Amino acid sequence: MEKNIEIKNLCKVYGNITILDDINFVAKEGRVTAFLGPNGAGKSSTLRILLGLDQATSGSATISGINYKDIRNPLFVVGATFDGLGSPSDRTVYQHLRIVAASNGIEKSRIDAVLAVTDIAHKKNESIGHLSLGETQRVSLATALLGNPQFLILDEPTNGLDPSGIRWLRNFLKEQSEKGKTILLSSHILSEVEAVTDDVVFIHKGKIIANGELKKIMKDTVSLEEVFFNLIQEGGKEDEVIL
């Protein structure tokens, strides 16, 4: 089975408000797919459904054809950064990772490995509450990597990172995709992911307005921001989706 993430005919309605309107896209194995749009566009709602944290009104969001809730030992399959660390502020970074590893049957040796990969080992004895936002992002990523998963689902991974941290993240994502990982990341800051993404999915007001390879979507434009605003001005209709 292909190691893809597939969002198919996904709809989410709260009362009489449509949050997601027939969302369709695929994040492919060995590629970085950037899920882009302004705050409130529907990115987090889509990821919440994908990770089993919310239910769709209709449609599906699957990982290798399986719903997240049906995956056995999910941390070995999917690593996600979403909704913070979920640990007490006085717990150290190492304690946090040790608890997550132990509760999921992950070998202790993986802790030092992910601390090294995310360049946060020097903070392992620091309390989580004393970390900067960028450092917390690195710990979230280290947590996601504990099970050495095939899939990485990252919600706004550049938040809180300084320029050197963003450069590091870009290199990290490139290395992981070259290893064959399937990476889906969301962001509302288009310029920060442009250098690392292979495929782009634009969402606006709950609808996909463009979807395809970065080089095809960019064409003769100078930036993803320009592409996005051009699409908005043109109306972003479904028949304008780029494949």
Please give the residue ranges for each predicted region.
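Conserved ABC transporter NBD signature motif
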Residues: 59-74
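Conserved ABC ATPase "signature" region
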Residues: 98, 102, 108-123
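Catalytic Walker B motif of ABC-type/P-loop ATPase nucleotide-binding domains
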Residues: 152-156
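A short, surface-exposed alpha-helical micro-motif characterized by mixed small hydrophobic
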Residues: 193-195
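ABC ATPase "signature
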Residues: 211-212
